[in-house]
Amino acid sequence: MTLFPIFADLTGRRVLVVGGGAVAVRKTQALLQAGAEVVVGAPRLDPALAALAEQGGIARLDGGFEPAWLAGAWLVVAATDDRAVNAAVSEAARARRVFCNVVDDAELSSFQVPSVVDRSPLIVAISSSGVAPVLARRLRERIESLFDHSLGQLAALAARYRPRIRAARPDLGQRRRFYDWLLDGPVAARLRQQQPGLAEQELEQALRAPQAAPRGSVVLVGAGPGDPGLLTLKALRALNEADIILYDRLVSEGVLALARRDAERVPVGKLPGKGHDATQARIHALMLAQARAGRRVVRLKGGDAFIFGRGGEELEYLRAHGVPYEVVPGITAALACAAYAGMPLTHRDHAQSVRMVTAHCRADQDTLDWAGLARDQQTLAFYMGVGQLDYVTARLLEHGRAPATPFALIENGSRPEQRVVTGTLADLPEIARRRGVRPPALLVIGEVAALADTLQWFGQHQRGLPGPQALAA
């Protein structure tokens, strides 16, 4: 360890910033956030610094650097683009035993400013000892993705209740388990949901119940269409905090690979024609049993849980049984598959609206407004439609949709094996059969589908019926 990590209390303490440009602006703003009394010395000031000086937010020293500027300073930051000036600041600071940071110059610095993840009062600092600042910034970005912004509120709440927690849990082992519950349980969940009052109620109840059984929870997470890079930061955090993951058939291996290594994984996917209602009842029972056992359950669904994902039914069940829950949206197939096919769902010249439709309705029910769906100047996105292509095509043509309307079938959208098959509505079922389209596939119908022929950028693209050679193969 070449540098000793230290956090300095600069509240009300004089810090000198030498330089008046953009770098000096950033350093000054950071120091002001830490409560420092900032003095900026430079011949000219950036407008932002000049405004701060006029408002009394900082003091100003005009002209070129002079060692006398260091009088009373606890720290100095040299932020000029002139190495000779920076060296003079460094030498003067060394002579007066004042710590000096020269921006982007480790050789002239006696301290380094780390990359910071700020969840005040929790602060995470990352330093490369001045050797590789880019690496430190990259690590900061990754750490930022792991910590919800409510973590600072949680740290402040824990600090405020620390004496009471110590009194209620005098045994060290009990206290550690209580803090684990505090960090991972319903209190943290309430803060993530922007409900600080309810968070404090949860904490008060736990303190009044000396040995309360652990209380589990469920997070309903949308996994997106398959590309793990489309997972949201909040979804990633949920996967890394899960004790058990109940995942659907269409969740990709790449997404599951991002989950906590020791989390239990239970597949609960539904297969076509295999009794969905019975499977859904099993999912409900599993969520309830695992949550009541005190476990953190992630219910992981392909796409978005609230777009043809039966997420609403699952929340109703959890609410009826008193299980706390959260919802993390995912990128639904219509948005992701269209984007990966290079196909805008709306376009000023072609479509002023989008309709997401399930082609997999409840048995013996078809309540769709086919006359409305057949209108032009709109885009239709059919989910779960591969087995219903003949029916969908017939109904749209019957209600007046033009036979020449373009379509696109996006198979395995956003995954390495993605394939886009395009053509016109009249030939849709035949093209799909001859091309061997298989689920999962999203069907897009509308003028925008033709743009996939020219704007496609990812995976394979096949247009129309296969030629004789392809048929022979």
Curated annotation (Swiss-Prot):
PROSITE patterns assigned to the protein according to its UniProt record, in alphabetical order: SUMT_1 (PS00839), SUMT_2 (PS00840)
E.C. number: 2.1.1.107, 1.3.1.76, 4.99.1.4
Protein residues bound to S-adenosyl-L-methionine: 225, 302-304, 307, 332-333, 384, 413
GO MF terms, alphabetically ordered: NAD binding; precorrin-2 dehydrogenase activity; sirohydrochlorin ferrochelatase activity; uroporphyrin-III C-methyltransferase activity
Residues at the catalytic site: 248 (proton acceptor), 270 (proton donor)
Family note: In the N-terminal section; belongs to the precorrin-2 dehydrogenase / sirohydrochlorin ferrochelatase family.
Protein name as annotated: Siroheme synthase
